[in-house]
Amino acid sequence: MIKTRYALLAAVAAAGLAWSAAQAQEKVVVRASGGGTFGEALRRICDEPFTKETGIAIQPANTDDSTAQIRAQQLTGNVIWDISNTSADTIFSAAKAGWLEKLDWSKIDPDNKLPPIARHPYGVGINSYSETLVIRTDKVPAGKTMGSWADFWDLKTFPGPRSLHDTPVKNLEFALIADGVAPGDVYKELATPKGVERALTKLDQIRPSITVWWTSGQQPLQLLASGEVYYATAWNGRVAPLQREKVPVKIVWNGGALIVGYHSILKGAKHRDDSYKWLKWCWNDAQRGAELTKALPYPGFAPGLMELLPKDLQTELPTYPDNLKVQFEFNGEFWADNLPRIQKVWDRWRLKGN
């Protein structure tokens, strides 16, 4: 109990560093998001113009683990952040715990322009990416086309080393699709022990060819670039840089998992009204959405965004119509509820082999 208390206090103290710089300002919103390219783009494209027009300052708080800090702030009653990034699965667990504000969509999207996928009760969709099959086109046998998960599982037609993410999440969905389950039915199937076993049995078929279980987002691209593996799952935004370096890799969008990221307002946020203003400003504007997508190819959902982008960039995006229609939407709520149960089964399965 004492260790838990210290951990909570440490998390709140870390979050408080962002607040201390903004504390003296009368109108300020503390926004927690990842840093790097995305954080810099948010500052330049959304934060600074918003402050110039409204007089409301945005104080960024960079974090790699928003869930732990949201939890700490809520359990201690010391809510420092106003807005935080939430992932496709953690948004459900945080909302169920009562840590997030249920959004008033009339303040963010009064004209109902945003698509349903961007309008979560507890978060506005800010970006999207896909986990897909990525292939070395020079390793595909002559006269053949690898275009589905069934092909990925076809070791006779498409021999060679493969790589998958070291997690049950999305691997089980891909396995069931390869086994003939319609994408719209995979979560119904995985909700049963029989469905999980079916997915693992399917994975057994290709297990000898999974030479690397990747654990970081850049790893499968490095494996593909070096030729250590021929086919792998990977996140779409990391593929284009390899293509620009003339590495012969290609995304297979068919059967990909589309994943949405969100911005949420914390329960008890000190600057709730100004937070709503910023969410509307940044995420319900096509021009700003297009500029953010040019900086990082994980598009948001503001109507008209796609048309403002160059055609060659459009076709690289998961929400480009031709790409979107062949994917399924990742169900974060399912994994928020079922990961502990399925992870135990997965861990036992992984211990049996490579």
Describe each region flagged by the PLM.
Residues D322-N354:
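Conserved C-terminal helix/tail region of periplasmic/extracytoplasmic solute-binding proteins
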Residues I91-S93, A225, Y231-P248:
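A ligand-binding cleft/hinge motif common to bilobed small-molecule-binding domains
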Residues M1-L9:
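Bacterial N-terminal signal peptides that target proteins for export
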Residues S33-R43, V79-W81, N85-L223:
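Extracytoplasmic ligand-binding site segments that recognize negatively charged/polar headgroups
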Residues A18-A24:
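Sec/Tat signal peptide C-region and signal peptidase I cleavage site
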Residues K113, Y129, E197-I206, Q243-A269:
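Periplasmic-binding protein-like
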Residues Q25-A94:
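Early extracytoplasmic/lumenal segment of secretory-pathway proteins
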Residues G261, L266-F330:
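Mature extracytoplasmic/periplasmic domains
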